[in-house]
Amino acid sequence: MLKGKSLLTLLDFSNYEIESIINLSFSMKSFVNLNSVPKTLENKKIALIFEKPSTRTRISTELAVKLLGGTSIVLSKSDIQLGRGETVEDTARVLGRYVDGIGARVLNHNSLEILSKYSRKPVINLLSDVSHPLQALTDFMTVKERFGTYTNMAFIGDGTDNVLTSLMEFVSKMGLELRVASPKEFRPKQEVWRRIEEESEKSGAIIEFYEDPYEAVRGVKVVYTDVWVSMGQESIAEEKKKKLKDYKVTRDLMRYASKDAIFMHCLPAVRGEEVEDDVIDGHQSAVWDQAENRLYTAMAVLSLFI
């Protein structure tokens, strides 16, 4: 039973619960296509907090609330500044009196923990500096949609990436295989990796790290990348780009993957940097399906948790 719980990290849930989210995501896609969406959020109010700019997450989440019959109240960085002036605890207490649930894209993951504790309402992680669970759920929905089942994946680029963290969490819970190609200095932090490793041992998941991207993608069905420089990393942008220049997803790299492999990217992409135009626009690209599926995953999560 997920109703009333917060979704801050996938590690908090069983493989059965995670699978139930994926299954409902597929159902929501069918409901939208049939124009018969259940109004599971009717008479409910959802606060959507965005400390960071957002395109896909904001549009998909706002639209999800609307389609489910709810009302969304969007609070951008100029409307709300968590922990600046008013404490996050006080903000959470007030929001908890007004709304039925909170979705938040935050600069500091700890803000999500505080919002959940003090609002006493379900809080959905719409991205933090640590993780992005909605994206990982969307990604593996897309994988299952393409192949009929979950399959092996290679992530190329920054091993400290927040989307990668959630991909690893999903893999560790579901007993899958993930290969990560990155320079040694761009590996997950120990505090992040510790719990993922524990869950992997329980489920039989295999998460391996490579320095050679060609070795990592050999024979895999899914090749995934993300931007090299995230928001807030502008001061180290040039340094990161130099160190990651050999981790671009190219047509040549894709040839080493399975013949029916797909390319994935959570967007926005910096074309010519982490991925070539020929790949993201090519026949193997599943990027636009991913973007569409964000809506259905958001609908499933909102329906189950709030």
Curated annotation (Swiss-Prot):
L-ornithine binds at residues 162, 226, 230-231. Belongs to the aspartate/ornithine carbamoyltransferase superfamily. OTCase family. The lineage of its organism: Archaea, Thermoproteota, Thermoprotei, Sulfolobales, Sulfolobaceae. The gene is argF. Its EC number is 2.1.3.3. Its main location: cytoplasm. It is found in: Cytoplasm. This is Ornithine carbamoyltransferase. Pfam families: OTCace, OTCace_N. Reversibly catalyzes the transfer of the carbamoyl group from carbamoyl phosphate (CP) to the N(epsilon) atom of ornithine (ORN) to produce L-citrulline. GO terms for biological process: arginine biosynthetic process via ornithine; citrulline biosynthetic process; L-arginine biosynthetic process. It catalyses: carbamoyl phosphate + L-ornithine = L-citrulline + phosphate + H(+). InterPro entries: Asp/Orn_carbamoyltranf_P-bd, Asp/Orn_carbamoylTrfase, Asp/Orn_carbamoylTrfase_sf, Asp_carbamoyltransf_Asp/Orn-bd, Orn/put_carbamltrans, OTCase_ArgI. GO terms for molecular function: amino acid binding; ornithine carbamoyltransferase activity. Pathway: Amino-acid biosynthesis; L-arginine biosynthesis; L-arginine from L-ornithine and carbamoyl phosphate: step 1/3. NCBIfam families: orni_carb_tr (TIGR00658), PRK00779.1 (NF001986). PANTHER family: ORNITHINE CARBAMOYLTRANSFERASE, MITOCHONDRIAL, ORNITHINE TRANSCARBAMYLASE, MITOCHONDRIAL.
